[in-house]
């Protein structure tokens, strides 16, 4: 129990690192939550601080999720505080990753007002199912490129993840064929992709959570007032 508590606590602290807020202070001496959409995430960093800073913020937020789901769990597996928790490996990584996402959304370092957690959640899933997440990232990037709406891309990607896992597990894997080559591709890069059913359940919960946290964006999309991203450098 102490080991599980330590994993969740360390993951929460890592997730709580307020990347975009720190970037806003360093780059322009501002609190990014007072500009743009008012959100302390990578998307607003793109809008307010420019694409280079926005990309850096997004990548760091992704890394937070990877570290929580992979490195923190691995560390405490080798250095447990008492007995290591008897929990399914994928479920444990999901718990650690979600603790980081909660830290990102409710950061202890910035008055519990952080970002929406999309990038950190993506990082967690990259650490658990990298090949499936490559597909999701492809969907995300194509949607951003053609629509210029990060909110739409986030929603599409969130819905796509559990569908991809379910199709790979219950259609391609059972029937053989295509998923063998998908796995072979991943293993050629030392990617070990999980198709554990916990991921499908979690993916569905994340999809609903993303829809909930993007409800204001959805209202703006319907009214035609949602901000589009641009790829030009801001002054």
From Swiss-Prot:
Classification via SMART domains: G3P_acyltransf
Pathway: Lipid metabolism; phospholipid metabolism
Domain of life: Bacteria
Keywords noted in UniProt: Cell inner membrane, Cell membrane, Lipid biosynthesis, Lipid metabolism, Membrane, Phospholipid biosynthesis, Phospholipid metabolism, Transferase, Transmembrane, Transmembrane helix
GO cellular component, as recorded: plasma membrane
Keyword Transcription carried by entry: no
One Pfam family per UniProt: G3P_acyltransf
TM spans (from-to): 4-24, 56-76, 94-114, 126-146, 152-172, 194-214
Reactions performed catalytically: an acyl phosphate + sn-glycerol 3-phosphate = a 1-acyl-sn-glycero-3-phosphate + phosphate
Topology within the bilayer: Multi-pass membrane protein
Biological processes, Gene Ontology terms: phospholipid biosynthetic process
Gene Ontology molecular function terms on file: acyl-phosphate glycerol-3-phosphate acyltransferase activity
Family under the similarity heading: Belongs to the PlsY family.
Biological role: Catalyzes the transfer of an acyl group from acyl-phosphate (acyl-PO(4)) to glycerol-3-phosphate (G3P) to form lysophosphatidic acid (LPA). This enzyme utilizes acyl-phosphate as fatty acyl donor, but not acyl-CoA or acyl-ACP.
Subunit structure: Probably interacts with PlsX.
UniProt-listed PANTHER family: GLYCEROL-3-PHOSPHATE ACYLTRANSFERASE-RELATED, INNER MEMBRANE PROTEIN YGIH
HAMAP family: PlsY (MF_01043)
Protein name, entry field: Glycerol-3-phosphate acyltransferase
Organism, scientific name: Chlorobium phaeovibrioides (strain DSM 265 / 1930) (Prosthecochloris vibrioformis (strain DSM 265))
Gene: plsY
């Amino acid at each position: 129990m102490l080991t599980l508590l330590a994993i969740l606590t360390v993951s929460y602290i890592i997730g709580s690192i307020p990347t975009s807020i720190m970037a806003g202070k360093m780059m322009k001496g501002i609190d990014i939550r007072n500009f743009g959409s008012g959100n302390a995430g990578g998307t607003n960093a793109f809008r307010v601080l420019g694409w280079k800073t926005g990309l850096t913020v997004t990548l760091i937020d992704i890394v937070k999720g990877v570290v929580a789901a992979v490195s923190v769990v691995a560390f405490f597996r080798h250095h447990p505080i008492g007995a290591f928790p008897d929990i399914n490996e994928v479920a444990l990584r999901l718990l650690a990753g979600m603790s980081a996402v909660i830290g990102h959304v409710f950061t202890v370092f910035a008055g519990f007002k952080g970002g929406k957690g999309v990038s950190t959640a993506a990082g967690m899933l990259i650490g658990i199912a990298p090949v499936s997440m490559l597909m999701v990232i492809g969907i995300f990037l194509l949607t951003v490129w053609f629509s210029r709406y990060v909110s739409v891309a986030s929603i599409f990607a969130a819905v796509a993840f559990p569908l991809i896992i379910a199709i790979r597990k219950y259609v391609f894997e059972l029937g053989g064929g295509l998923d063998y080559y998908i796995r072979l591709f991943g293993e050629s890069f030392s990617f070990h992709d999980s198709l554990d059913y916990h991921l499908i359940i979690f993916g569905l919960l994340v999809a609903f959570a993303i829809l909930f946290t993007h409800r204001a964006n959805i209202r703006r999309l319907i009214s035609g007032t949602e901000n589009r991203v641009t790829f030009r450098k801001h002054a």
